[in-house]
UniProtKB/Swiss-Prot annotation:
EC number: 2.1.3.3
InterPro entries to which the protein is assigned, alphabetical: Asp/Orn_carbamoyltranf_P-bd, Asp/Orn_carbamoylTrfase, Asp/Orn_carbamoylTrfase_sf, Asp_carbamoyltransf_Asp/Orn-bd, Orn/put_carbamltrans, OTCase_ArgI
Protein localization: Cytoplasm
Catalysed transformations (reactions): carbamoyl phosphate + L-ornithine = L-citrulline + phosphate + H(+)
Binding-site positions, carbamoyl phosphate: 53-56, 80, 104, 131-134, 260-261, 288
A Pfam family the protein falls into: OTCace
Protein name in UniProt: Ornithine carbamoyltransferase
Family note: Belongs to the aspartate/ornithine carbamoyltransferase superfamily. OTCase family.
Organism listed in the record: Cenarchaeum symbiosum (strain A)
């Protein structure tokens, strides 16, 4: 199955059929293990990363290798961007060398500029407002754990950040209702919320217990970038928005806990939750590999 969009920048580009197709493909790839088939033989992925990365970098590089392709890691200091070359010129030049670009950037406008200038597909590996690759892995993990997506209810606790924004789009596409508990000043993008409310029930609250009540999945993320910690920002969330055992008891008995990682135990989540029996975070992390392999195939590169 080939998706309609050239690029994946926010998650809104994918409809229900496309997301389910990617998930089904990812599950097949995971079950199939290391295949001798190399559908991306001769293809090259450029990884343009302005920010540090563990899961995104390694999962894309390993995924391309397993599919028979190559991945080139391009940190800021290794590119002429650091010496004043424009983003459009860089994107146009890279398009002549590689088959797909993954960019991990500070400002979302940068990924939009890359996509507008590149003639090859561009994937958002994380920006300040969206993280669509994470949501494909999340939805795959939920499907594995719950056996379905439509009709479930999710709770997001903490910061209405880039992951939350893309999660809203993903939930809207597959029919998962969601309650988002954040401080009033840290809510997700209003336009994203309004769009998703056309398809699903989206509740916004400042009360984590209200959001978690009866939830099938409980999500959280760091309250500030782990590479650029803002202690004053963190204090606006603690201890009220920490996911702990009492909060998980508000959720459904068979609820799962999810976190995109990296995590700060004792900050946004207690160790007994992230390391406990309800935690799906390690499946979630592994599924970055499988879902992104499926995405690369769906882009038709």
């Amino acid at each position: 199955m080939k998706i309609r969009s050239k690029d994946l920048l926010t998650g809104a580009e994918l409809d229900r059929k496309e997301i389910l197709g990617i998930i089904e493909s990812a599950i097949r790839l995971k079950k199939g293990g290391r295949s001798k088939a190399h559908p991306l033989d001769g293809r090259t992925l450029a990884m343009v990363f302005q920010k540090p990365s563990t899961r995104t970098r390694v999962s894309f590089a390993a995924g391309m290798f397993q599919l028979g392709g190559e991945a080139i890691y391009l940190p800021p200091g290794d590119m002429q961007l650091s010496r004043g070359e424009t983003i459009p010129d860089t994107a146009r030049a890279l398009s002549g060398y590689v088959d797909v670009i993954v960019a991990r950037v500070f400002g979302h406008e940068t990924i939009e500029e890359i996509a507008a200038s590149a003639s090859v597909p561009v994937i958002n590996g994380l920006s300040d407002t969206f993280h669509p690759c994470q949501i494909l892995a999340d939805l795959m993990t939920i499907k594995e754990r719950k056996g379905r997506l439509k009709g479930l209810r999710a709770a997001w606790i903490g910061d209405g950040n880039n992951v939350c924004n893309s999660l809203l789009y993903g939930c809207a596409a597959v029919g998962i209702d969601i309650s988002v508990a954040t401080p009033a000043v840290f809510r997700p993008i209003p336009g994203v919320v309004d769009k998703c409310r056309e398809s699903i029930d989206v509740k916004l609250t400042t009360d984590p217990a209200e959001a978690a009540a009866g939830a099938d999945i409980v999500f959280t993320d760091t309250f500030a970038s782990i590479h650029n910690m803002d202690k004053e920002r963190e204090r606006k969330f603690l201890p009220k928005y920490r996911v702990n055992a009492p909060l998980m008891k508000k959720a459904a008995d068979d609820a799962i806990f999810m976190h995109c990682l990296p995590a700060k135990r004792g900050q946004e989540v207690d160790g007994e939750v992230i390391d406990g029996p309800q935690s799906a975070v390690w499946d979630e992390a592994e599924n970055r590999l499988h879902s992104q392999k499926a995405l690369l195939l769906a882009l038709g590169i």
